[in-house]
Amino acid sequence: MSEGSVIFKGSLNGLTIIMKEEEDYDSILKQIEDKIASSGRFFKGAILSVKYRGKKLTEEQERKLFELLRDKSGAKIKSLEEDTEEPVKPEPVQQQPRFRSKIRMSNFYFKGLEEGITKFHRGTVRSGQLVSFDGNLVIIGDVNPGGEVCATGHVIVMGSLRGMVHAGANGNREALVVALNLQPTQLRIADVITRPPDEKETVGQFFPELAYIKDGMVYIERYLPAR
């Protein structure tokens, strides 16, 4: 079995499985199963349309792959089909000044991250509710005290975050937590756990804030883009 013969690439509500053409089919199935198992509970609740490319599959092989995804991932698999579209080749771009002073912090925060599946959850996460995902998680709403959100990638809350949050749940210390009002009862990135001070300074207007790891500690900063 060749390691790295299977790659998952995804976007919102979609997953593409890239398989090495020369790899044995049974080995590919085993690698896919291992990838799903290592993701734990984070596939659960997702609704995915799946495509594959790189290796031609018979109808029987395609059926077995569909059953594996359906039975092992915990996600709802809407469809499975071969990706017949040719990958888009990026056009060459001339090197030009990039105004690094304005994007320096953004480059720092996102260094080393790979694009992955992003799940959008619309609505308030209430007390006792858990929303989790293997990838980036965007909450369009609030996270109330007693609510919990967990993701292997970034966690972004388009509202008040007053519950528990865990980003980088698979050990990714490059993950971020971002919220319009960041007041979690517990904040965790990878294996680093913290909580905000009991008396957090508040003003009449909320500002987006982000949390990240630097030198083994969690830092929380206001996000004020340069004008």
UniProtKB/Swiss-Prot annotation:
One of its GO terms (biological process) is cell morphogenesis. SUPFAM superfamilies: Cell-division inhibitor MinC, C-terminal domain. Keywords: Cell cycle, Cell division, Septation. The keyword Cell division applies. The keyword Glycosyltransferase does not apply. InterPro entries: CAP/MinC_C (IPR016098), MinC (IPR013033), MinC_C_sf (IPR036145), MinC_N_1 (IPR055219), Septum_form_inhib_MinC_C (IPR005526). Coiled coil: none annotated. Gene3D superfamilies: 2.160.20.70, 3.30.160.540. Transmembrane segments: none annotated. Interacts with MinD and FtsZ. NCBIfam families: minC. This is Probable septum site-determining protein MinC. It comes from Acetivibrio thermocellus (strain ATCC 27405 / DSM 1237 / JCM 9322 / NBRC 103400 / NCIMB 10682 / NRRL B-4536 / VPI 7372). The gene is minC.
